[in-house]
Amino acid sequence: MKVQFYEEDGHTLAVFGGEWADTNKTQVLCFCIEEGHVGATPDYLATLKRATKYKAQQLFEQLKNDYYYTDLIAEY
């Protein structure tokens, strides 16, 4: 699975799957984890910065143990 990490306005977002190049056709999942909030958001966050792969892997390990998000992430 492709996992990318971004930061915007003090929030950390992880993007699972998809490609940023074609924002009209590709829907990706963004997870905001700074405040324990996890949710889906559109894929037009073009100004976000890439963060470390290590941090992205940490989030994936955390989410894959959650029953609900295991099914959600498995689609990607």
Model-identified regions with their sequence ranges:
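A short beta-strand micro-motif
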Residues: 2-10
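Short intrinsically disordered terminal tails
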Residues: 1-2, 71-76
